[in-house]
């Protein structure tokens, strides 16, 4: 394998959280008087940090979301995670193969550290990623699509950007990885391939990833 580090996005790549999160986000925004469909939420907010939700709502309506918006939303999301959240199918096999091949991996997510921990604890992924290998947009000044988060993760893991590959499912994340000078594999399970066109490779089933990485010898 030509890569010395595999950097995983979290939501939609490791845990199947995007349907849950975007369903709840669309519902909460609509409840607050900002009509938003599930499809709107996927298009506008998937892969982004929470500040983007605040910024877009204010830009479009001139109104600010309530001060407790994030806290209420996360409470609802975490409760739903406990009931519904599962790993993305095939992830466990990929992680086992990387471990067997002694290829390091880490997480770099727009989500908060708390959100990542809750999701991993619920799905059992916490056995694969300790806190030293989890990086959040909270750790850097600018989130995706800026490259800062991926560059920070590579620096903390001690690997040069050109030796990293990122696994992403959002246009914002693909843009960030390309800007960081990293190869990026675009996961198209929820995102149309055309929106991830800047990715190095595209794949639609997580079970394909191990073979794709092996092709890069």
Name these PLM-found stretches.
Residues 9, 13, 109, 169:
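Conserved G/P- and acidic residue-centered "switch" motifs that form tight phosphate/ATP-binding loops
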Residues 35, 104, 183:
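Residue-level detector of anion-binding/catalytic polar loops
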Residues 1-4, 96, 112-217:
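Asp-based, Mg2+/Mn2+-dependent phosphohydrolase catalytic module
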Residues 104-109, 124:
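Hydrophobic, well-structured mid-protein blocks that either form specific transmembrane helices
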Residues 16, 85, 107, 141, ...:
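Residue-level marker of alpha-helix boundaries and capping positions
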Residues 2-101, 117:
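N-terminal helical cap/lid subdomain that shapes the substrate entry/recognition surface
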Residues 44, 108-110, 167:
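Structural motif
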């Amino acid at each position: 394998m030509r890569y010395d580090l595999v950097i995983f996005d979290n939501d939609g790549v490791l845990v199947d959280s995007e349907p849950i999160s975007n369903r709840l986000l669309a519902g909460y925004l609509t409840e607050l008087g900002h009509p938003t469909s599930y499809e709107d939420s996927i298009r506008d907010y998937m892969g982004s940090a929470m500040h983007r939700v605040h910024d877009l709502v204010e830009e479009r309506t001139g109104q600010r979301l309530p001060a407790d918006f994030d806290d209420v939303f996360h409470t609802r999301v975490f409760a739903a995670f406990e009931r519904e959240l599962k790993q993305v199918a095939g992830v466990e096999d990929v992680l086992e193969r990387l471990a067997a091949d002694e290829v390091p991996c880490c997480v770099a997510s727009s989500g908060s550290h708390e959100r990542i921990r809750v999701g991993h604890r619920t799905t059992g992924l916490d056995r694969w990623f300790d806190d030293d290998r989890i990086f959040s947009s909270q750790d850097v000044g600018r989130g995706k699509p800026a490259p800062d988060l991926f560059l920070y993760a590579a620096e903390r893991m001690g690997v040069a950007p050109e030796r990293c590959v990122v696994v992403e499912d959002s246009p914002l994340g693909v843009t960030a990885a390309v800007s960081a000078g990293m190869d990026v594999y675009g996961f198209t399970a929820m995102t149309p391939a055309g929106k991830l066109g800047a990715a190095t490779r595209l794949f639609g089933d997580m079970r394909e990833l191990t073979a794709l990485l092996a092709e890069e010898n």
